[in-house]
Structures are given as structure tokens and as C-alpha cells.
Amino acid sequence: MIPVSLVVVVVGGWTAVYLADLVLKSSVYFKHSYEDWLEKNGLSISPFHIRWQTSVFNRAFYSWGRRKARMLYQWFNFGMVFGVIAMFSSFFLLGKTLMQTLAQMMADSPSSSSSSSSSSSSSSSSSIHNEQVLQVVVPGINLPVNQLTYFFAAVLISGVVHEIGHGIAAIREQVRFNGFGIFLFIIYPGAFVDLFTTHLQLISPVQQLRIFCAGIWHNFVLALLGILALVLLPVILLPFYYTGVGVLITEVAEDSPAIGPRGLFVGDLVTHLQDCPVTNVQDWNECLDTIAYEPQIGYCISASTLQQLSFPVRAYKRLDGSTECCNNHSLTDVCFSYRNNFNKRLHTCLPARKAVEATQVCRTNKDCKTSSSSSFCIVPSLETHTRLIKVKHPPQIDMLYVGHPLHLHYTVSITSFIPRFNFLSIDLPVIVETFVKYLISLSGALAIVNAVPCFALDGQWILNSFLDATLTSVIGDNDVKDLIGFFILLGGSVLLAANVTLGLWMVTAR
């Protein structure tokens, strides 16, 4: 949930700003000087909204807009084509997202929750891996509070790049550019450009399209550049960090099951999960997925060692149907099952580390027939979704983790980048990588959402200009053309509102 302290700071801060603004504007002594100061600095204040506009950057915008005229013409032509395609594609994307949300709501409904625990676990796991392209983000709920800096920085940069696109395109089409500004609405930052509306209305629909599509076009290009930077990050950081030999532990949560004297520590290099080699973050995630979805793997043990370590036990069934044969309070012993030479399933309680250390993994006794001595494949008898995982992090002794693989995934932070020198921070590549991922996601989302033909978004003006450019010669009656545009806008607005409303409900009500 959203921390109460954060809400108090935000509401309290805005209340103080608004009251101070109200008092100064009401004061006989400060009213005129305060309003002159606001006007001089391009500031305007209203409840939960601060806006700053300046003409300082006008010279730079005009310089960019008049440089390489032919290249800019082609650049914004590409943007116009992209914008029109994105506008119509957004209907399909929003429709698909809405269907996914409805399907997820039906899957989570009480009527569907009567299925077995294994099938519900499978469906919840699959939903993790089939995430929607568009998803509502609520700080403190599905956006970690400790990543708000990345989020808002990426939002601001995406907004600035978006508006720079509009500004340069407008100057290229001979529309007067009045200024550039930044605003803060509650906690969300953004940017805007001030264009001379009369000039904008006098140019042709195609010219208008180039201007209106420029913002989402620049966001799309920024997202592509972010993807390129993410792919090339190992090469960019190669002089300082190397990759491909394992994953480095950067943080272990205080409540993580991996904490302990023989657990994982910051700076450990993990090379294997069970028999699954780990060379990067993707390998780590794939190995954990495989371990979670496949049956518990076994370990080969010789008959003599098994006889030496085992002792008489009384097995009993747990509530989930699995078998337990050790003391519930034991921190070192684990119940194992195996088949003897007569193919009879037996259970024995063994000290876990001695049983699985320096042994090969197996599925059946046949996998252990590598020597003349008799061997058995012993499999940990654990609760349904619990796994025993041997984590190799040399030179330390292997960690034996018992729990759900997802708990290891969510409570241990890792990176593929290993510093070449001791003075280098292990967090720097993570910071860069995380920020670039946010920039890709938010810039791409800004391009998609703004392309939707919806009231008050770029999509509204893109649609109007597109209809003016294509239907004016076909439909002589402007009222009919406007009616067509209105119904398309209405459909896009309803579709977007439905996605946002249901998305918020899914995020906050679950």
C-alpha cells in the first residue's frame, strides 16, 4: 500500500503551497509584487498544480527547427505515417488489453476459485509471464516506492522529448512558437509547448498531422534508442564491468529465506541453481521457472551412505497429501523418498547437507548407475510448491534453500555485471539498467496512449487532421465528417476509460 507518510507529505506540501499563494494574493502589501513576480518568472499556481513557462529556449527551438530543412521534412513525414498507423493500431491494442483484463477478472472470480490448488498456482504463475502490454501503474501498489525516482525522472524526460518533437515540427511548418514549459500535477511531472493557435489553424491538414504526430514519433524513437542502449549496455560498460560468468547478489531482503550463516550475501557470485548453469539474470529467472514448474529433482546417494545416515522414522501425510517423516522443528533434516531394489517407495529422514552435498542430480535410480556400487535416487518429500534448491556461489559452501522458488526470486536482487575493480559500485549498472527500462516503458506507453483517438489527447487532433486530409474531397458535408470523427473519438475515449478503470480496480482491489 501507499505509505501514509508519503500521502501526508504530498497533501501537506500542496496545502502549504496553495495557502501561501492564497495569502500572498490576498495581502494588500504583497499582492502586486507577488503577482508581478509570478508573471515575470512564468509561474502559475492552482490546487495541486504548478506550471512554469519560459521563452529562454525559443532561440534553441528555432535553431533546431530551421536546420537541415529537407532532412526534417522527411523525418516528420515518417512521424506522420507512424502516427496514423499508431492511432488505428491503438484500438486493437486497447481492445486486446481490455479482453485480457476481463479474462483475468473472470479467472480471479470466486466461481473460478473452486479449482484445485495446483491449477490455481499454475494460472497465477502463467499470468506473471503473460503480462499485458499496457498496465495501470499506481505508486506504492504495483510500483515500488524505492523506484519512484526512476519513474518520475523517466516520465519527465519522456514528456520533454514529446514536446520537443511538437515544437520543432511546428517551427518547421512556420507556426509561431511562444514558449516551452514544465508542470507538476500532484506528484506527476510533465512538459508542454505553447504554439500560436491561429497559425496552427491556417496551415494544411497534412502540415497539422506532421506537428500532432511529432510527439508520439519522438517517444517511439526514444524507446527504440533505450532498447538499443539496453542491448549494448554490456559493451558500453565493458571497460569497467564484465558479464557471462554468473549473477552478482546486490541485495537480500531482511525477510528473505536466503538469509543465514550459510545463505547469500551481497557480493556473492551465483553460478548454478541445482544443475542449471547461471550466467546472467535471464538464466537465473529461467532456472527458477524450470525448478518451480518441474517436479522436485533428486540426488544420488550410495546405499552405504544411505544406511549410515538414515534412522528409523514414522511417516505421515501432510494436509496437501505429501509425506513427512522428520521432526517438524528440525532445521537441518529433510524427509526424502526413494525406491529400493524391489521398486518399493520408502521414506527416510536425512541431514540435508550431507545427503545432497557433492552428489549428482537424478530423476530415477537409473540415473545413478554410474559405478559398480549400489546407489539410489533420493527425492526431497516437501509440500506441493516447496522445493529444495542447491545454490552454488563459490568459493562459499553451497546454500541449501527450502521454500517456494518465487520467494527466492522476489527477495534476492541480482545483476549480470561484475566489477573489474574493487572501487567500482555494484549498484551502478543496476541503476542505469533500471532507469533505461523505465524510460523504454514510459516513453513507449506515452506514444501508445497519446495516439488513441480520445478527447484531450494528441489522438484527437491527429484524427481530426487525418479526416480533414482524407474525407474533405469525398464527403462534402462537414457536419457528416465531424459526426464520424465524434463517434470515433467517443469509441476511443470509452475504450481507454474502460481500460484505465478496470486496470485500477485490478491493481487496487486485489
From Swiss-Prot:
The record describes its membrane topology as: Multi-pass membrane protein
Q: Which protein is depicted?
A: Membrane-bound transcription factor site-2 protease
Keywords, ordered alphabetically: Cholesterol metabolism, Cytoplasm, Glycoprotein, Golgi apparatus, Hydrolase, Lipid metabolism, Membrane, Metal-binding, Metalloprotease, Protease, Steroid metabolism, Sterol metabolism, Transmembrane, Transmembrane helix, Zinc
Positions annotated with a glycan in the UniProt record: 328
GO MF annotation terms: metal ion binding; metalloendopeptidase activity; RNA polymerase II-specific DNA-binding transcription factor binding; transcription regulator activator activity
Any transmembrane segments, and where? 4-24, 75-95, 96-107, 136-160, 165-177, 178-200, 220-242, 438-455, 456-467, 484-504
Cofactor annotation = Zn(2+)
